[in-house]
């Protein structure tokens, strides 16, 4: 994830020599005055020269509510959908939004009101919408940002937005932290996965067994791939076996150990770990003439 506001181009320029192959350009709630076509034009020479890509755009906020920031989030989604092709990508990711403080099911009428026009906008431009599976501290009964964090909610979501252009931005971390096994879940839902975040998790089984999930001590942590408990080789195999041709973009800045001065050490380790799990570098099959 390479969104850094007005410094995004400089940040991508710094990341390219580290070996990153793709970048998600992400925003929090608003575009912060950034003109997306101009940003796309700034990034294009860097991407072309390095053979890297923008995999997706992302807007994280709550487009279902009516506060000033929420309405800016909705406008940012419209602009991101319009601009995605200029970045050479066809995916815009983010949260569904949520009617704050209400159960998941109570958000569905408002979800349809807001998202059906956005889905139509995306369909007209050949763009896909991918909802991240992050609960943002919410539960089924209450929350502030997102309802697309659980398979029960996905069923409601996809029934409300019956378009092949609507899917998931999936990562194992958020499922592990809900005590869900990500491998069988991915097998079931892989056809709906449009984009993947490279983020892992670690469960403290002793804490879970002795203190449960509601104590003062956390029972799980977000980790960079390679430091967590996910079998990324299996995940990549499931994705490839289902025909997935998208990116896995590392979501950093969460690992409790590889942080601060170790942040990029952890992210580059995660990159190399994922590259090994996919089988390393691409190797052409030999061509033997008859």
Where are these regions (language model features)?
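Acidic-and-aromatic substrate-binding clefts and catalytic sites of carbohydrate-active enzymes
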Residues: 1-8, 26-40, 62-73, 98-103, ...
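Acidic/histidine-rich catalytic cores of soluble enzymes
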Residues: 22-23, 57, 116-229, 281-284
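Active-site clefts of carbohydrate-active enzymes
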Residues: 219-223, 245-260
């Amino acid at each position: 994830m390479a969104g850094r506001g007005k410094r995004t181009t400089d940040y991508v320029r710094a990341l390219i020599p580290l070996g990153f192959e793709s970048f998600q350009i992400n925003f929090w709630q608003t575009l912060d005055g950034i003109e997306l076509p101009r940003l796309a034009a700034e990034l294009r020479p860097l991407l072309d020269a390095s053979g890297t890509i923008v995999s997706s755009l992302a807007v994280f906020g709550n487009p279902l509510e009516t506060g000033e920031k929420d309405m800016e989030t909705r406008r940012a989604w419209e602009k991101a959908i319009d601009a995605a092709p200029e970045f050479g990508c066809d995916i815009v990711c983010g949260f569904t939004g949520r009617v704050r403080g209400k159960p998941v099911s109570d958000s569905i009428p408002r979800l349809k009101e807001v998202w059906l026009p956005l889905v139509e906008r995306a369909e007209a431009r050949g763009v896909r919408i991918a909802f991240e599976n992050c609960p943002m501290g919410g539960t089924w009964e209450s929350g502030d940002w997102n309802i697309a964090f659980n398979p029960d909610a996905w069923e409601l979501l996809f029934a409300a937005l019956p378009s092949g252009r609507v899917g998931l931005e999936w990562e194992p971390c958020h499922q592990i932290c809900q005590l869900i096994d990500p491998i069988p879940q991915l097998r079931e839902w892989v056809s709906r996965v449009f984009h993947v975040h490279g983020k892992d998790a670690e469960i403290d089984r002793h804490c879970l067994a002795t203190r449960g999930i509601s104590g003062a001590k956390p029972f799980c942590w977000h980790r960079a791939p390679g430091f967590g408990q996910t079998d990324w080789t299996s995940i990549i195999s499931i994705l490839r076996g289902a025909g997935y041709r998208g990116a896995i973009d590392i979501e950093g800045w969460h690992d409790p150990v590889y942080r601060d001065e170790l942040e990029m050490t952890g992210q580059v380790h995660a990159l190399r770990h994922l590259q090994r799990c996919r089988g390393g570098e691409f190797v052409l099959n030999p061509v033997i003439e008859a």
